[in-house]
Amino acid sequence: MSATVVENAKSDVTTAQSLAGKYLTFALGNEEYGERVLKVREIIGMMDVTPVPQVPPHVKGVVNLRGKIIPVVDLRLKFGFEPQPYTERTCIVVVQVQRGDSRIMMGVVVDAVSEVLNISDSEIEDTPSFGEELQTDYMLGIAKVKGKIKILLDLDRVLSSDTTVLQAVNN
């Protein structure tokens, strides 16, 4: 076997193993999603969000979280889903996203937080190909847990187009 084949095989194993771990799962409509717990800083109930002019519609504005201004993105709108009224289960998941060398605290509005799951690599499959026209690089993979499908997200990529706007809001 060539060294390249061995290195590629090691890389594939490392990638699969690196996806295993604890995920905070949450709902958007009838779909379940997961984000690595290590990115989550806290979960807060829905609160008043101060709108910011001239931002995309999915950027809801900012909140004052214990003296720190946190930009808030409605993940439902970011994904192009129909807007829904917020309920008592709607909450903001405060996450830390990577932008180059810096980290930005952001709030992500979700319909409901479900649970923290320890997902093993055997429960995670690669993201299927949906053709060239659909972008899936924001998905880490698809988990099958307890008979249900969970789409594992890479919020760094989901929110990458927003971080420039949100950094400006944050400053």
What are the roles of these predicted feature ranges?
Residues M1-N171:
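An acidic, low-aromatic, low-complexity terminal/linker signal
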